[in-house]
Amino acid sequence: MKFKWDEFFVTGDPLILGAQVSIALSTIAIIFVLTYFKKWKWLWSEWITTVDHKKLGIMYIISAVIMLFRGGVDGLMMRAQLALPNNSFLDSNHYNEIFTTHGTIMIIFMAMPFLIGLINVVVPLQIGARDVAFPYLNNLSFWTFFVGAMLFNISFVIGGSPNAGWTSYMPLASNDMSPGPGENYYLLGLQIAGIGTLMTGINFMVTILKMRTKGMTLMRMPMFTWTTLITMVIIVFAFPVLTVALALLSFDRLFGAHFFTLEAGGMPMLWANLFWIWGHPEVYIVILPAFGIFSEIISSFARKQLFGYKAMVGSIIAISVLSFLVWTHHFFTMGNSASVNSFFSITTMAISIPTGVKIFNWLFTMYKGRISFTTPMLWALAFIPNFVIGGVTGVMLAMAAADYQYHNTYFLVSHFHYVLIAGTVFACFAGFIFWYPKMFGHKLNERIGKWFFWIFMIGFNICFFPQYFLGLQGMPRRIYTYGPNDGWTTLNFISTVGAFMMGVGFLILCYNIYYSFRYSTREISGDSWGVGRTLDWATSSAIPPHYNFAVLPEVKSQDAFLHMKEEKTELYPESKFKKIHMPSNSGRPFFMSVAFGLAGFGLVFEWYWMGVVGLIGVLLCMVLRSFEYDNGYYISVDEIKETERKISE
């Protein structure tokens, strides 16, 4: 790639110029605030180097919300372009760039980190653990994700964004058809972030299997913990495939290999297969934790034990197995034999069965329950019908013969947005609001929260339901404009109105965070909603102490904390206080991730010397870690007593 220095910064587009100015001003403002209030040491010692799973979870969530804003703006720009025929708001290349970054950001850099953030905050508390199995690795997982996300996101101001779609199909993603650094940003940003996700999968799988408190058998675990465990198993099996695929395509682009190009025997369809062998399990990586969140919320606010617990566990396991047997349904039209299409059509339909089991379990959990219509519960209730719509249309798409009509139309676009927004995004909002007091010590305002819910949910349906009809009328996806005689103007305009309603809803959420920080009553009991059933509600609010539990609880039933409340069990008797061993903070994961970012940035522009320097930095950090003998530290009994006294005041 012959890179021209005068093209280093993207210029000539007022939207990108505005983004560059806002980034510069935001950076200056952050530096000024940290310097003025003398918070640099606090930022380093309390957040950047922390190994506390709760703080890392909050950092994941903050990053995900920022990515939600970026990906949401991309989506609004696409809808603005398609609102009217022959619109010139975006040119074709800019639209393709936004189309690519929107999909990649929303799935890889928003949905996954949001859920991983909630998992970090909640799951160790739910199983009665002091921290995760590998705290150092947890910090490294976050920073590799964050650096990968930042590497991907700087592409729109430095060098140029990828424009081959979020799936980066070959040969469209080849050097001939996608010259420049954009596609390299995609490959290396995802590679670095994917390493962090794989480490998270290993970490939480070990944590759940080996660090549960006394009495917590597998069949006493909360459903969110169960869905997390199965999700981590999927990650461990699926993400190595993505890692290999990204590496092979990187070799094609950077070193002239031909794994996916027709020259020298390469196979473009091999990329499609490898991508979707990872890609469809990825759908369940972001859906299964959402199922767990809704299970916790519905059970709590219906004030009933989850109906069909064993059936729920079985359905989760069935979904995880079938998720690896459906990938070809993404390209029924791309030359498979009838027998191959038939097999994957059957497996795709079959996966709807365990999903349907869960829907009925949630409905029966609410049956005859004393339901409180709180904001989290509203999101859970909205999820069920909207997700069913997405699921039913998914079964329609699973019919290989019919898919020839639906494929690459807006019918498909509407389907996966009904699944991913109604499933994953609704769950992110519900879980965020539900566990918000656990993280920050106060609830979000319910009145403002309900405005957010109704505007966003109604806007979502106004935006995406018309797209089913656009698809049936033949509107293909990925087009940046259309003619006035195509007959798509009215539905596209309605869809755009709905998209901007969703944007307004997000702004209301941001206002709610500010308003609640200023005016909400501080909550210290830990059981913020008064309906807590699991051990996460047995700890204090506003980031529980690093050690989580002054005394590790003993579990005697499925809804452990509810049982303790009913039995009036003393949670933390001082007579049982013992000194607690905790892991030390470390800054090395941060520096290792920066080295990864340096290597990635160098390889994006094919500056191999910079790539080598960055990789040497990564290796050096690993070597130094190998010679580090840090046995952590102990929290004394007196310190535990003082901490618990302050919590109870």
UniProtKB/Swiss-Prot annotation:
Instruction: Tell me the GO molecular function terms.
Output: copper ion binding; cytochrome-c oxidase activity; heme binding; oxidoreductase activity, acting on diphenols and related substances as donors, oxygen as acceptor
Location in the cell? Cell membrane
Q: Output the GO biological process annotations, alphabetical, semicolon-separated.
A: aerobic respiration; ATP synthesis coupled electron transport; electron transport coupled proton transport; respiratory electron transport chain
EC no. given is 1.10.3.-
Membrane side Cytoplasmic: which residues?
Answer: 35-56, 118-139, 210-227, 293-315, 363-377, 426-452, 511-584, 632-649
The record describes its membrane topology as: Multi-pass membrane protein
Q: Where does heme a3 bind?
A: 415
**Which superkingdom heads the taxonomic lineage of this protein's source?**
Bacteria
Q: Name the reaction it catalyses.
A: 2 a quinol + O2 = 2 a quinone + 2 H2O
Q: Where does Cu cation bind?
A: 280, 284, 329-330
Entry's Gene Ontology cellular component terms: plasma membrane
Q: Name one Pfam family in it.
A: COX1
Entries under InterPro entries matching the protein: Cyt_c_oxase-like_su1_dom, Cyt_c_oxase-like_su1_sf, Cyt_C_Oxase_1, Cyt_c_Oxase_su1_BS, QoxB
Cofactor(s) the protein requires to work: Cu cation; ferriheme a
Q: Where is this cross-link: 1'-histidyl-3'-tyrosine (His-Tyr)?
A: 280-284
Q: Does the keyword Coiled coil apply?
A: no
Comment on bound cofactor = Binds a copper B center. Heme A3.
Q: Which protein family is named in the record?
A: Belongs to the heme-copper respiratory oxidase family.
Which PANTHER family does the UniProt record give? CYTOCHROME BO(3) UBIQUINOL OXIDASE SUBUNIT 1, CYTOCHROME C OXIDASE SUBUNIT 1
Q: What is the documented function of this protein?
A: Catalyzes quinol oxidation with the concomitant reduction of oxygen to water. Major component for energy conversion during vegetative growth.
The protein's name is Quinol oxidase subunit 1
- What species is given as this protein's source? Bacillus subtilis (strain 168)
